[in-house]
């Protein structure tokens, strides 16, 4: 199994169980699904017998519909307007560029040109995206973008390839 972590915060962003697709060698688009999770206790897991005097004891249980990738990686929803996202992205891309200059200098020009091409389309449809950050909520870390596929039902996330560290387990 491969886990992709934010290179700055170290937060897990996604794993290969979500079948990431590398787009133009610059971003991963990762499809996700809605799932229902239980927020309560399963009474079968409690090691006790129901009281004979009081009838059946109930355990309150609630369910919630969540996106599996958000739930599994413990991503946190955040919000940006276009102006604040541009400011964040400028600083984040600078940090990625500095990292690439140290670790993989020949990748810098490819990264710069391709990320600019991709982000032009993001900004054209900026209001369609939701924003998620890693579990540590590090303000310098990656902000993943979430939108829906053309069917309007399937959520997908966008992660910058060069902002990730891949670990194999």
From Swiss-Prot:
Gene3D superfamilies the UniProt entry points to: Metal Binding Protein, Guanine Nucleotide Exchange Factor, Chain A (2.170.150.10)
Keywords recorded for this protein, A-Z: Calcium, Cytoplasm
Keyword hit for Cytoplasm: yes
Pfam families: TCTP (PF00838)
Compartments reported by the entry: Cytoplasm
CC terms in the record's Gene Ontology section: cytoplasm
Domain TCTP, chain residue ranges per copy: 1-169
Domain of life: Eukaryota
A molecular function (GO) term: calcium ion binding
InterPro entries: Mss4-like_sf, Mss4/transl-control_tumour, TCTP, Translation_control_tumour_CS, Translational_control_tumour_p
Family membership: Belongs to the TCTP family.
Function recorded in the entry: Involved in calcium binding and microtubule stabilization.
Name of the protein described by the UniProt record: Translationally-controlled tumor protein homolog
Organism: Schistosoma japonicum
Name of the coding gene: TCTP
């Amino acid at each position: 199994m491969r886990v992709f972590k934010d290179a700055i915060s170290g937060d897990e962003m996604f794993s290969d169980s979500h079948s990431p697709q590398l787009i133009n060698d610059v971003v991963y688009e990762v499809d996700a699904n809605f799932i229902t999770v239980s927020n309560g206790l399963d009474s079968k897991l409690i090691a006790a017998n129901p009281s004979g005097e009081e009838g059946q004891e109930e355990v309150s249980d609630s369910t919630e519909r969540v996106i599996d990738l958000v739930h599994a990686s413990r991503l946190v929803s955040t919000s940006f307007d276009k102006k604040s996202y541009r400011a964040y992205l400028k600083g984040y891309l600078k940090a990625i560029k500095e990292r690439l200059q140290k670790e993989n200098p020949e990748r810098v020009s490819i990264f710069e040109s391709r990320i600019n091409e991709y982000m032009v389309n993001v900004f054209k449809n900026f209001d369609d995206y939701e924003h998620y950050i890693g579990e540590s909520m590090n303000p310098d870390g990656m902000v993943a973008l979430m939108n829906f596929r053309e069917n309007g039902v399937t959520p997908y996330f966008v992660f910058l390839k060069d902002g990730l560290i891949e670990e194999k387990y």
